[in-house]
From Swiss-Prot:
Signal peptide: none annotated. It is found in: Cytoplasm. Keywords: Cytoplasm, tRNA processing. Pfam families: CTU2 (PF10288). GO terms for molecular function: nucleotidyltransferase activity; sulfurtransferase activity; tRNA binding. This is Cytoplasmic tRNA 2-thiolation protein 2. GO terms for biological process: protein urmylation; tRNA thio-modification; tRNA wobble position uridine thiolation; tRNA wobble uridine modification. Plays a central role in 2-thiolation of mcm(5)S(2)U at tRNA wobble positions of tRNA(Lys), tRNA(Glu) and tRNA(Gln). May act by forming a heterodimer with NCS6/CTU1 that ligates sulfur from thiocarboxylated URM1 onto the uridine of tRNAs at wobble position. InterPro entries: CTU2 (IPR019407), Rossmann-like_a/b/a_fold (IPR014729). It comes from the Eukaryota. Pathway: tRNA modification; 5-methoxycarbonylmethyl-2-thiouridine-tRNA biosynthesis. It comes from Drosophila grimshawi (Hawaiian fruit fly).
Length: 397
């Protein structure tokens, strides 16, 4: 018989409960000897659960994670055309610096690919000066800019870029949760279209372990459980024209990103958007705040959440017919009449009918109405149908 709880919990409750761990920010120490190369260094980097090491040893360790993620899965063919996404975050600048370093090595260690940089402008010209500084530092790369809701043909080089007014469908959605979810799907669709326009076969995204842990929980909460494996995997093949989305920083944590930014003197810049609002303003913001708190107090728990995503198998698509995928997010459709989805639509139908349910004849019509709602938009998955329901008028473009 299991004895857990007999000795581990006293009169005061969980006396042996998990205690907060070390800070996610780590420590940059003063001068000393590196525990790995034994050389004197002006600055030592102390990661959690790792001995203090010099800057060169730390950079070598972090860059190895980047190369190992790509090499272990053999996800990037030789001489591939790569589109690298930069959003101003520390992680995206780390990815840019790592790729630049990998391409400036000798022939044996060089990462053989041709890279271009894309910045998606969501709020005008606020970040252009920072982008120009990046372009000067990483001159070999071509920089492109496009607005979030613009057509792919409006793509411009950084030197020639000027913002224009575009229509924003997000403002027609009632809740911030729906606007953020729709904006994310639109961003992915735009990235795929731009990659196809530039004839790039692969896209690099700068998601790290804590970001992917947040994405995993958010996807499940939003009803995207069927595609959550691809949302957090190294390789996501849902973009159009067989373009592959790669996440080579998936094994890095926030602490390592902050140290890398400090070591390379990178200057992150962020754009003001809805993600910066109150932590309780949307489901995504609430989940992000929850994971951020875990990262500070229980860093290993975030790793557990993230590693759980690695063990989830992606839903296999037995038919390559485009009609079997969602027109918005390109995930495999889930419109089959399952008990769970039927119960959700039944509950919505009850709320809409209100006092009319007192009539006995309406009970049979209620279930019929719920079934009709499930089959009304067969080209959208469950989560994207929820976005459609949040529109004040019209349909998802």
């Amino acid at each position: 018989m299991c004895s857990i709880g007999e000795d581990d919990f006293g009169d005061e409750g969980a006396t042996h409960a998990m205690l907060p761990g070390s800070s996610a920010t780590g420590t940059v120490l003063s001068a000393g000897s590196c525990s790995k190369c034994n050389l004197a260094s002006d600055e030592l980097y102390k990661l959690n659960f790792r001995a203090a090491e010099c800057q060169l040893c730390f950079l070598s360790y972090a860059r190895h994670k980047f190369r190992a993620a790509l090499g272990a899965a053999k996800a990037l063919p030789r001489s591939a055309e790569v589109l690298l996404l930069v959003d101003g975050s520390g992680a995206s600048l780390v990815l840019l610096d790592m790729l630049h370093f990998a391409q400036t090595q000798n022939t044996f260690k060089r990462l053989h690919c041709n890279a271009r940089v894309l910045y998606i402008d969501a709020c005008g010209n606020d970040s252009l000066s920072s982008l120009h500084k990046l372009h000067e530092r990483y001159a070999p790369f071509e920089f492109y800019v496009i607005q979030l809701n613009a057509e792919p043909k409006s793509l411009q080089s950084l030197k020639e870029y000027s913002a224009s007014i575009v229509n924003a469908t997000q403002q027609e959605l009632r809740s911030l949760t729906a606007r953020q979810d729709y904006g994310l799907q639109q961003r992915k669709r735009l990235i795929g279209a731009v990659a196809a326009h530039l004839q790039c076969s692969h896209v690099f995204e700068s998601s790290i372990s804590s970001t992917l842990a947040t994405q995993l929980l958010t996807s499940v909460a939003l009803g995207r459980g069927g595609s959550v494996a691809l949302d957090v995997a190294l390789l996501d093949d849902r973009l159009q024209d067989d373009i592959k989305l790669l996440r080579p920083l998936k094994d890095l944590n926030e602490q390592e990103v902050q140290f890398y930014v400090h070591a390379q003197q990178l200057q992150p810049f962020t754009s003001e958007n809805e993600l910066d609002q109150s932590s309780a303003a949307s489901l995504q913001n609430l989940t992000s705040a929850f994971v951020a708190n875990l990262q500070i107090n229980y860093a290993s728990t975030v790793s557990t959440i993230f590693r759980t995503g690695d063990k989830i198998a992606a839903k296999q698509q037995t038919n390559v017919d485009p009609t079997t995928t969602c027109t918005l997010c390109h995930s495999v459709l889930d419109h089959q009449l399952s008990d769970t989805l039927l119960a959700i639509e039944y509950s919505r139908a009850v709320s809409e009918m209100g006092v009319a349910l007192q009539q006995h004849d309406n009970m049979e019509a209620l279930e019929q109405r719920a079934r009709q709602r499930l089959t009304a938009a067969q080209d959208l998955c469950h989560a994207c149908r929820n976005i459609q329901a949040e529109l004040t008028s019209g349909n998802i473009p």
